[in-house]
Design a protein with these regions (language model features):
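Non-catalytic, topology-defining segments of multipass membrane proteins
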Residues: 1-270, 325-328, 332-347
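C-terminal transmembrane module of eukaryotic multi-pass membrane proteins
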Residues: 258, 263-347
Length: 347
């Protein structure tokens, strides 16, 4: 059992291994949200937003997305970016790659989401080991089976998630076509060592910085009593787009990418924007690409360590007006929306 404490919780492989070491539990999941706040007394996120411990844990998880990027880049390299697009036969070369890119993303990412959902919510052995680690057990019945109507309609979430993968695949094709047209990217990683290394190091920070502001703009800013409420862009975006994501108030794996297409376009711009502004090696692009596609999965799975879920973001879904960003970049502290589990605590 010492391995549970000594091994880093790298999702998903180490997480699965650590779950397998857990004894089967008979303890019922918590039935009240107050239990969540009580557990947060020992939460590693508490008081650590932006500090070394949280950053170390975050970067260990980032290694999963980097490995996915390396696997994809070296096994299925992108088309030759030195093609002469003046040649009519090459002008729409990316169209030949679009079906492959879409298939690769749907299979790779969809398999991760469906597999993790199965392990946590369908597999009886795993369920029996993790029940007491469920943040809010009100959507599980007495046998541990999921009750979709209580905050996690996983089939509906899966539909919108697949839509999101399609939209991100479209963005990926646009970036490749842009690279073919402008020759802005480069294929030799060490030909520009400084920008190559820095772009990899800052992917996580950029994604979390972008996520906070992209997320915050989709929540109301003015109160319902404010005279400015009719001019509130956040209220409009929440009502017409982001509210779909918040249908999952007791989240599961498929909740992460369950978004309205408008929100998908905003969320995945995190990958598109830097790719057309700065020279970027395809490996850095893929790293960012898989980060935005896969990180919502463990972040929404609804369970604490070692399953890999995020209590920080769970509190956002539970309370709506807190924790818009991530623990890695302390923007919630800066703008006054940080909650370590006590802000909405009830007696």
């Amino acid at each position: 059992m010492d391995l549970l404490n000594t091994l880093p919780n790298i999702w998903p492989l180490i997480s699965l291994f650590k779950i397998s070491l857990l004894p089967k539990e008979i303890k019922e999941p918590g039935s009240r949200l107050e239990n969540v706040h009580k557990k947060l007394e020992e939460n590693t996120t508490k008081g650590l937003q932006g500090k070394a411990t949280e950053l170390a844990a975050r970067h260990l998880r980032l290694s999963t997305y980097l490995l996915m990027a390396m696997f994809t880049y070296y096994l299925t390299p992108y088309p030759d970016i030195t093609l002469d697009l003046k040649d009519e036969s090459n002008r729409f070369y990316i169209l030949y790659w679009a079906p492959f890119i879409l298939s690769r993303n749907v299979i790779m990412v969809g398999s991760l989401y469906s597999g993790w959902h199965y392990f946590l919510y369908e597999n009886k052995t795993m369920r029996g080991k993790l029940r007491s680690r469920k943040f809010d057990g009100r959507n599980l019945d007495e046998n541990g089976d999921l009750i979709p109507a209580k905050g996690y309609h996983w089939k509906e979430c899966a539909f919108w998630s697949i839509n999101g993968i399609i939209i991100e695949s479209f963005y990926e094709c646009m970036v490749l076509q842009y690279w073919l047209t402008t020759k802005q990217t480069y294929t030799q990683f060490w030909s520009r060592p400084l920008i190559s290394v820095l772009s990899l190091l800052f992917v996580g920070y950029w994604r979390d910085f972008h996520f906070y502001f992209a997320h915050r703009v989709m929540h109301p800013y003015f109160s319902t009593k404010s005279k400015w409420r009719n001019f509130d862009l956040g209220r409009f975006l929440y009502r017409n787009a982001h509210s779909l994501h918040h249908r999952s108030y007791n989240t599961g794996p498929w909740s992460g990418l369950s978004m309205h297409p408008i929100e998908h376009l905003i969320y995945f711009s995190c990958v598109f924007i830097p790719s057309i502004i700065i020279p970027q090696h395809p490996l850095a692009f893929l790293y960012n690409h898989f980060h935005v596609l896969v990180s919502p999965l463990p972040g929404h799975d609804g369970f604490g360590d070692p399953a890999g879920g995020s209590k920080f973001h769970f509190l956002h879904h539970a309370h709506f007006d807190v924790n818009f960003g991530t623990p890695m970049v302390p923007l919630d502290r800066l703008f006054g929306s940080y909650d370590d589990g006590h802000r909405h605590k009830t007696d």
